[in-house]
Design a protein with these regions (language model features):
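Active-site-proximal beta-alpha core segment in soluble small-molecule metabolic enzymes
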Residues: 1-101
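Active-site anion/phosphate-binding pocket segments in diverse small-molecule metabolic enzymes
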Residues: 83-196
Length: 196
């Protein structure tokens, strides 16, 4: 169904390698980092770099296409040029470790398109995962004030998913807060690190 997936668990990457070996296929992955939104991704940046190296060296059927981030979702952490520069710097660390350039540095989803729209997306980000902005067109208009996308429909799909990973992460988002994935400005209570 797809040739590239977002990954943030070593166990899942190993299982993917086994299945690719069984099917005699190669699958591309974007390894995710968490830059404060507390959604998916490696929280520990050294661990992310180590995992990227292990994918590169130890998983011949899993191709490390790049790294990525998700922002303005669970934790409502705003996509900013600073957050994107943090991702680009992390990509450079991975590239130095694996000895080649990454094909993909994925700067987020629809909410990150605002940086492109306003001309503030830093160089080095070469990929966005724009789904809602294309399929619904609501968030950019209603939540981010971009009005030139009103030709898009807002009733095109229903998404159902299974929870496939749980991690220990802080309960308070890191970075400048904006809106969450539902257009709300939630308040957070810092309860320390929790399994989620």
């Amino acid at each position: 169904l797809c040739d590239t997936s977002l990954q943030s668990e070593w166990a899942t990457l190993m299982a993917l390698e086994e299945e690719c070996l069984r099917q005699n296929r190669t699958h591309r992955v974007i390894v995710m980092t968490d830059l404060g939104d507390l959604r998916e991704g490696f929280w520990d940046k050294d661990e992310l770099v180590d995992v990227c190296q292990r994918v590169e060296q130890d998983l011949p059927h899993v191709h490390l296409a790049g790294i990525g981030v998700n922002l303005s979702c669970y934790g409502s952490t705003k996509p900013t040029p600073d957050k994107m520069n943090e991702l680009v710097a992390l990509a450079h660390r991975v590239e130095a470790r694996i000895g080649r350039s990454l094909e993909v540095v994925s700067g987020g989803a629809t909410s990150s398109f605002t940086l492109v729209h306003w001309g503030t997306m830093p160089a080095g980000i070469n990929h966005l995962r724009i789904g809602e902005g294309i399929l619904l067109g609501k968030d950019l208009q209603v939540d981010w004030g971009i009005r030139d996308m009103d030709y898009l429909r807002m009733d095109t799909f229903t998404l159902r998913a299974e929870v496939v990973e749980v991690k220990d992460k802080p309960t308070y988002p890191i970075g400048e807060l904006a809106i969450d994935a539902f257009g709300r400005k939630p308040t957070y209570v810092d309860r320390g690190v929790r399994r989620r």
